[in-house]
Amino acid sequence: MSKGIKNSQLKKKNVKASNVAEKIEEKVEKTDKVVEKAAEVTEKRIRNLKLQEKVVTADVAADMIENGMIVAISGFTPSGYPKEVPKALTKKVNALEEEFKVTLYTGSSTGADIDGEWAKAGIIERRIPYQTNSDMRKKINDGSIKYADMHLSHMAQYINYSVIPKVDIAIIEAVAITEEGDIIPSTGIGNTATFVENADKVIVEINEAQPLELEGMADIYTLKNPPRREPIPIVNAGNRIGTTYVTCGSEKICAIVMTNTQDKTRPLTEVSPVSQAISDNLIGFLNKEVEEGKLPKNLLPIQSGVGSVANAVLAGLCESNFKNLSCYTEVIQDSMLKLIKCGKADVVSGTSISPSPEMLPEFIKDINFFREKIVLRPQEISNNPEIARRIGVISINTALEVDIYGNVNSTHVMGSKMMNGIGGSGDFARNAYLTIFTTESIAKKGDISSIVPMVSHVDHTEHDVMVIVTEQGVADLRGLSPREKAVAIIENCVHPDYKDMLMEYFEEACKSSGGNTPHNLEKALSWHTKFIKTGSMK
């Protein structure tokens, strides 16, 4: 081989070596930048240096949860709930041969990775206070899971007074931890403050997918136990009375897990013609109330349940003539965010923000704008009857069924099968200035009438229910006798397929039994038994 060829090959090797060295250097630089960025993120998210030493994997944190524990989690609806530790616990339990059970406390419903997967894995012994998951519902209705369905505003006091067992360990999602070891909550507050205060240990999930700009939305204020309880100093929906963090302290935090997963909120269905008709009827009623001087021009603070009908009603307010509105509610969904964006709402107070997957990018993009209009509170404050009565809430919630005297069933299908739970509807219904329940007049393609002679389960009595709205019309029950209520509901709210049947029942009951609230007890629940036997109430 000639000397020239050797020199040429040597040069090529040197060039390759140089290229390799450059690539290695680039990788080192990139790695350094990643490490530097990670350190910067950690510093912003975990501002207490000693607590940075408590960062562990989700698997390590899950090992801290023991069989028989009372486990409490943050969040309210699929917002602000822990994402990774619950998954790790499911994986751990599925690998075990022996039984592993916990009692689960939440604020409200939660993510499917908890309610759904834990139910399927047989992890949950007892569940309090509310759920919306189909797997959980199945286990509740077959008796596998003991379910205590309670008014959401009661939960914190039950824990504070040890009416229910104390919390062993709380798993809390956070935006950040402060220098003092306190927690900046994310999109769902719920019972977080109460859980943290009462838990022996706290696992914190720092979720980098939750924007740091969420800091400042929370207004954390907790109540003293009676007899030392003081009036809550809220006189309008926008009042801030607490802190922007949940008091914890670094000693109580036993583990920190870094996550990067967005809330898996539910997509909202399109507004159906029936939902739109309910919305139109309700807004027409509110307009009439303003014209008659029963409501101010900007209404009173609005509380609304969740779902397509509620969304349609609130969406209708965007197209209405109302302005300078306020909301004092639980869940802030798309329609409330849109009320803010369209300039109709000045302030919205709730305990969680639960935008649909379609609305989430817009919320994040405009988060600084929304932060000036939104207040997130613990649910014992967002759902507090004292405040609802003081500020005069307009409460709008959904009924499963209503009877001719205005009693409402919100929870049980055919009287026995749990659907979701009472949630916060009872917190507001008895204490609101105006209590409205909406429902479609029929279900199951017309085989079920949502207005029946007697409800198969009672969540809200006739004494709490003021107005019923269906796509057929509005029944204003205020100041009416039971017999007058029956006529108003049958004439205004019942589907044509069932109107004559209901009037026939009512007239027969008046003749056969009479009384202030006439019922034929032999036939009062016959519509339900007929459906169970034949598949139709007709």
Swiss-Prot record:
Top-rank lineage group of the source organism: Bacteria
One BP term from GO: acetate metabolic process
InterPro entries (UniProt xref): AcetylCoA_hyd_C, AcetylCoA_hyd_C_sf, ActCoA_hydro, ActCoA_hydro_N, NagB/RpiA_transferase-like, Succinate_CoA_transferase
GO MF term list: acetate CoA-transferase activity; acetyl-CoA hydrolase activity
Top EC class of this enzyme: transferase
Keywords per UniProt: Transferase
Enzyme Commission code(s) on record: 2.8.3.18
Active site: residue positions: 330
Binding site for CoA: 305-309, 420, 424
Pfam families: AcetylCoA_hyd_C (PF13336), AcetylCoA_hydro (PF02550)
Induction entry: Efficiently transcribed only during growth on ethanol plus succinate.
Catalytic activity: succinyl-CoA + acetate = succinate + acetyl-CoA
Keyword Chaperone: no
Role played: Forms succinyl-CoA from succinate and acetyl-CoA.
Family the entry assigns: Belongs to the acetyl-CoA hydrolase/transferase family.
Protein name: Succinyl-CoA:acetate CoA-transferase
Lineage: Bacteria, Bacillati, Bacillota, Clostridia, Eubacteriales
